From Swiss-Prot:
Name used for this protein in its record: Voltage-gated ClC-type chloride channel ClcB
Listed CDD domains: Voltage_gated_ClC
GN (gene name): clcB
Main localization (coarse): membrane
Function field: Probably acts as an electrical shunt for an outwardly-directed proton pump that is linked to amino acid decarboxylation, as part of the extreme acid resistance (XAR) response.
Entry keyword Transcription: no
Transmembrane segments annotated in the record for this chain: 5-25, 54-74, 146-166, 173-195, 222-242, 258-278, 288-308, 316-336, 339-359, 380-400
Family: Belongs to the chloride channel (TC 2.A.49) family. ClcB subfamily.
Amino acid sequence: MFRRLLIATLIGILAALAVAAFRHAMQLLEWIFLSNDTGSLVNAAEGLSPWRRLITPALGGLAAGLLLWGWQKMNQQRPHAPTDYMEALQTDGQFDVGASLVKSLASLLVVVSGSAIGREGAMILLAALAASSFARRFTPREEWKLWIASGAAAGMAGAYHAPLAGSLFIAEILFGTLMLASLGPVVVSAVVALLTTHVLNGSDSLLYTVHLTVDLYAREYVMIVSTGLVAGLWGPLLMWLMTASHNSFLRLKLSPPWQLALGGLIVGLLSLLTPTVWGNGYSVVQSFLLSPPLFSLIGGIFACKILAVLASSGSGAPGGVFTPTLFVGLSIGMFLGRIWGFWLPGSDEIAILLGLAGMATLLAATTHAPIMSTLMICEMTGEYQLLPGLLIACVVASVLSRTLRHDSIYRQHAAEH
């Protein structure tokens, strides 16, 4: 057991280093190509001329597509191992190292160029790949899946500062159940990854800064649970829209480079309306939580952002769908909060409260993992007083969503990509 805990610690450190390497590579490329050192792609887009804002996502998509297409052509004849940590866990615990690195590099290109896709997909993949490489060299074959799972959880902890949610992500989504025998090393890896990330970043700050002073009474719980009901309907709709977008791109019968370029061009066109469509939505989520926008502005940004997410995901851009889902959930929750605010005092507080509820419940509705979704929002924001209400709302959203659509967003995304 102590041997496993030691290995889990080492994997946590490796995973944090992998996440940090991807993050620093992003910052370097943003500085080189976009002259941006703020870490915010929205700020980068605002500083570009309209024509550069238009073509940059298209060029990034084209470059990523050429990279993936070229690698595929070069390796047509050799057998393929998984390039996805979920698939690796469901098979024999092995990765195609070269293809996984190429996929991560392609993800880096589309993320840096502004596509509305999450960076966490590549971060978790690299963390799991680092864990797999270590495990194959130093551990018996029957343990490989455990260490890949530990690496994936540690990658999520490093990316989102949420070790408990990262561990439950593995337990609820990948293992399908809370397996206590396997959860110990997974939790250790996740916590060590978070601590290592804090050391590398020089701070232990939360991922999102929130100033919420509202007291929770029966009225607030009713609003939170009602947000869960709405998210339970929106989750299947969002997944259906992603599938429809993916099928629409396939019907065009374009080669991968041109398909990804078209997706990037759509994002570029939308960014002419509002630069907030660039990137995974992290900086916009933070600005909304600090200063909730007006009703009409939420609706306009939401419409443009969801079209950008559909274009990026549907075109096959390699990356995650986790953070974009958080943005969509925040917008839905704040939209509902503004509606409640027509009749109730403290409209900004209500908007922030239901924005957080929207993030948690739409995440639960799309992942079918209510416990993970609840803890994720609490760990990212530090608002643990919301836990009871969010847990009820997330269960409601997950049950309703699963009733309407059996597959989660991760199973759907894996099947399409």
